[in-house]
């Protein structure tokens, strides 16, 4: 795992079309959410795919223009998904037992690209 600034530098060096920031949330909440910067279509696809796999609260899409990672990545599509709360026991267990669903939600989003 790279530190945040290094991750941004490496992603930009690769000149990629997609940069997907995979996160889990903390702070005593519950549910999934996804941040976007400028282009929300792919972020929406990732979040909707993941949300179809769980019954936790769906916190929706959020403007990520204040987030360092999203502001500084040059890729056009750069969702930052918070896959649930790792400090919530039930959600943490779901993440640990269903990490394949996290990956599948991203794969499904790529398959929907026209």
Enumerate the predicted regions with their spans:
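Catalytic-core regions of hydrolytic enzymes
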Residues: 1-41
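Extracytoplasmic/secreted proteins, especially bacterial periplasmic and envelope-associated proteins
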Residues: 6, 15, 41-49, 101, ...
């Amino acid at each position: 795992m790279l530190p945040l600034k290094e991750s941004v530098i490496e992603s930009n060096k690769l000149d990629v079309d997609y940069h997907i920031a995979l996160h889990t949330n903390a702070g005593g909440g519950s549910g999934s959410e996804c941040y976007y910067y400028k282009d929300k279509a792919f972020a929406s696809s990732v979040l909707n795919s993941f949300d179809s796999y769980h019954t936790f609260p769906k916190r929706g899409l959020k403007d990520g223009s204040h987030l360092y990672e999203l502001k500084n990545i040059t890729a056009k599509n750069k969702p930052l998904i918070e896959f649930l709360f790792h400090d919530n026991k039930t959600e943490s267990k779901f993440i640990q037992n269903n990490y394949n669903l996290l990956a599948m939600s991203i794969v499904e989003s790529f398959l929907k690209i026209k």
